[in-house]
Curated annotation (Swiss-Prot):
Summary of the function given for this chain in its UniProt record: Repressor of translation initiation that regulates eIF4E1 activity by preventing its assembly into the eIF4F complex. Hypophosphorylated form competes with eIF4G1 and strongly binds to eIF4E1, leading to repress translation. In contrast, hyperphosphorylated form dissociates from eIF4E1, allowing interaction between eIF4G1 and eIF4E1, leading to initiation of translation. Acts as a regulator of various biological processes, such as innate immunity, cell growth or synaptic transmission. Acts downstream of phosphoinositide-3-kinase (PI3K) to regulate cell growth.
Gene giving rise to this polypeptide: Thor
Name used for this protein in its record: Eukaryotic translation initiation factor 4E-binding protein
Record has Phosphoprotein as a keyword: yes
Native source organism of the sequence: Drosophila melanogaster
Gene Ontology process terms (BP): antibacterial humoral response; cellular response to insulin stimulus; cellular response to oxidative stress; immune response; innate immune response; insulin receptor signaling pathway; negative regulation of cell size; negative regulation of eukaryotic translation initiation factor 4F complex assembly
Motif, YXXXXLphi motif: chain positions: 54-60
Domain notes: The YXXXXLphi motif mediates interaction with eIF4E1. Compared to other members of the family this YXXXXLphi is atypical and interaction with eIF4E1 is weaker.
Induction: Up-regulated in response to bacterial infection. Expression is induced by foxo: in neurons, foxo-dependent expression is activated in response to insulin signaling, while in muscle foxo-dependent expression is activated in response to fasting.
Subunit structure and binding partners: Hypophosphorylated Thor/4E-BP competes with eIF4G1 to interact with eIF4E1; insulin stimulated Akt1 or Tor phosphorylation of Thor/4E-BP causes dissociation of the complex allowing eIF4G1 to bind and consequent initiation of translation.
Amino acid sequence: MSASPTARQAITQALPMITRKVVISDPIQMPEVYSSTPGGTLYSTTPGGTKLIYERAFMKNLRGSPLSQTPPSNVPSCLLRGTPRTPFRKCVPVPTELIKQTKSLKIEDQEQFQLDL
C-alpha cells in the first residue's frame, strides 16, 4: 500500500455524504455542462479516482478572493487585459551567412532498415 498512515486514517474516518435527489422531467432542465448540477454544485474526479465536490457558495467565495484578482506572475505583459496594443515586429531577413551554412550541410540518406516480426 502506498498511502501513508495518516491518509489511511482519514479514509476510515470519512463523513457520510448528504445527497439530495432532483427529478428532471424535461431535457431543457439539464445543465449545459454535464459535470454541474441544477443546484450549482460541481462534481469532478481525479485520474486516481478521488471524487471532488465543489459547492456553489465555496466557488463564489473563491471568485471574490484577492488571489483570483491578481494575474499569474509569468504571463507576458502584452497578454494582460488593459495593456496597450503594440505593433508586431517586422520580419527580419535571414543573414546570408546562415543560408550558406545550411546549404553546405549535407544530409546523408540511409537505407530503410528491415524489421523482422
